[in-house]
């Protein structure tokens, strides 16, 4: 089992409520990221040195591919969200649609702390998992 980690999970990884499970998944090579998440994490770097250290850390994780079919699937899900409940498509960020599509197409589980993935999973039926129960962080 591989988790497609969302930025929300990454930023909570050091919290005591998350750390044990995160480290277990990391040591089992169960953590992967797509390039969208990589860009978001690297955006948060505070210096060039911090950027390079983060990039090195991210290089050790499994890469979840993002290609044209990922964007096609993200568009399909966005359309379904628009049709299920008027303007519901506007409640899910574009990045989250792409990350969810990458996870779905690669057969990985979105690991997150973000309710947007519940909305997407209601449409796709794909597996997602909160890093800790919703509302506990």
Swiss-Prot record:
Q: What does this protein do?
A: Toxic component of a type II toxin-antitoxin (TA) system. An RNase. The cognate antitoxin is VapB18.
Q: Which family does it belong to?
A: Belongs to the PINc/VapC protein family.
Cofactor requirement: Mg(2+)
Mind telling me which HAMAP family this protein's record contains? VapC_Nob1 (MF_00265)
* GO molecular function terms noted in the UniProt entry: magnesium ion binding; RNA endonuclease activity
Task: Tell me the gene name.
Answer: vapC18
Q: Does the keyword Lipoprotein apply?
A: no
Q: What is this protein called?
A: Ribonuclease VapC18
Q: Do you know which PANTHER family this protein is assigned to? A: RIBONUCLEASE VAPC2
The UniProt keyword set, sorted, is:
Hydrolase, Magnesium, Metal-binding, Nuclease, Toxin-antitoxin system
């Amino acid at each position: 089992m591989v988790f497609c980690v969302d930025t929300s999970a990454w930023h909570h990884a050091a919290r005591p409520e998350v750390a044990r499970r995160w480290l277990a998944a990391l040591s089992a090579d169960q953590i992967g990221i797509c390039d969208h998440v990589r860009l978001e994490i690297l955006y948060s770097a505070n210096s060039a040195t911090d950027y390079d250290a983060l990039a090195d850390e991210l290089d050790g994780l499994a890469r979840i591919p993002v290609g044209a079919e990922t964007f096609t699937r993200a568009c399909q899900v966005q359309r379904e969200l628009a049709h299920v409940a008027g303007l519901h498509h506007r409640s899910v960020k574009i990045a989250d649609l792409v990350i969810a599509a990458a996870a779905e197409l690669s057969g990985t589980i979105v690991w997150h702390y973000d309710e947007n993935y519940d909305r997407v999973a209601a449409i796709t039926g794909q597996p997602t998992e909160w890093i800790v129960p919703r509302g506990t962080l």
